[in-house]
C-alpha cells in the first residue's frame, strides 16, 4: 500500500504532526502520510510510547521540543521540513481514501494553489456531529511553507497566514475531536489556560459581563 500510492505522487511533500502522549493515535496518523516522502514529528517530550512508535516508520524525523504554545510548535514543524509542500494533521484527524486521492490529484496538477482549506467532519465519542456549527468548519492543512506561516502571538486556535492563492478540497477530513466527556473537559481547560495567557500578553482582562453577552448572543 505504501509504495503503490507513493509512486503516483509527482511532488515531494512532508507530513507534519505535533504530539504529546499520542500513542493511541500516532500509528493511524502516520499511516495517513504513506504518500509523503518525509514525516516530521514535533514531540513535546511524551511520557508514553509516542516516539517509540513513530521511529518505527520510514522517513520519520522526530524533533523533541518543550511545549510553549501550539503556534510555536507548528512553526518549528515547518522549519524542520525539507520540502516546500507540507500536509499538517493533528493526532485526532484522519484522511479518507477519497481525500487522499484528491490531495494527490492536486499535487500532480501543473498549476496548484499555494494553500488548501479542508472541511472537517466532527465526531464526538465516535459519533458524527451534524450541527452546532461544526459542519462549516475548515482549516488549512495542505500548503507551501514558503507561502505561509502561523501567526505569532496566537497560543491556541492558531492561525495560518497565507501569502498566495487559496483552494478548497471537496472531500472532508475526519476529526475525532473528543473520545469522551472527561477528555473534552481536560481539553477545554487546557485551551482556556492558553487563551488566558494569550489575552494577558495583550494586556486584556477578563470581563464577566462581556463573556455573558458573547454567550447569550451566539
Question: Which stretches of residues belong to each language-model region?
Answer:
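Catalytic-site signature of metal-activated, phosphate-bearing donor transferases
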Residues: 72-78, 85, 89, 96-218
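Cell-envelope/extracellular polymer assembly enzymes that use nucleotide-activated donors
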Residues: 12-14
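Acidic helix N-cap motif at the loop->helix transition within catalytic regions
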Residues: 24-27, 48-56, 98-99
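Conserved donor nucleotide-binding strand/loop of the catalytic core
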Residues: 51-80
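Short, well-formed alpha-helical segments that are part of the catalytic scaffolds
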Residues: 16-35
Amino acid at each position: 500500500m505504501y509504495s503503490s500510492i507513493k509512486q503516483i505522487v509527482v511532488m515531494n511533500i512532508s507530513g507534519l504532526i505535533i504530539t504529546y502522549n499520542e500513542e493511541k493515535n500516532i500509528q493511524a496518523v502516520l499511516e495517513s502520510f504513506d504518500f509523503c516522502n518525509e514525516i516530521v514529528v514535533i514531540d513535546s517530550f511524551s511520557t508514553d510510547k509516542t516516539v517509540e512508535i513513530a521511529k518505527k516508520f520510514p522517513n520519520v524525523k522526530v524533533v523533541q521540543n518543550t511545549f510553549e504554545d501550539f503556534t510555536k510548535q507548528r512553526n518549528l514543524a515547518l522549519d524542520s521540513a525539507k520540502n516546500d509542500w507540507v500536509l499538517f494533521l493533528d493526532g485526532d484527524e484522519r484522511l479518507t481514501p477519497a481525500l487522499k486521492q484528491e490531495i494527490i490529484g492536486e499535487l500532480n496538477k501543473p498549476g496548484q494553489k499555494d494553500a488548501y482549506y479542508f472541511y472537517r467532519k466532527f465526531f464526538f465519542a465516535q459519533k458524527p456531529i451534524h450541527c452546532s456549527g461544526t459542519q462549516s468548519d475548515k482549516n488549512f492543512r495542505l500548503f507551501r511553507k514558503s507561502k505561509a506561516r502561523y501567526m505569532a502571538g496566537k497560543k491556541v486556535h492558531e492561525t495560518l497566514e497565507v501569502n498566495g492563492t487559496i483552494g478548497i478540497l471537496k472531500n472532508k477530513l475526519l476529526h475525532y475531536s473528543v473520545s469522551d466527556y472527561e477528555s473534552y473537559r481536560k481539553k477545554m481547560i487546557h485551551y482556556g489556560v492558553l487563551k488566558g495567557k494569550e489575552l494577558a500578553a495583550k494586556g486584556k482582562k477578563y470581563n464577566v459581563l462581556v463573556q455573558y453577552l458573547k454567550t447569550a448572543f451566539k
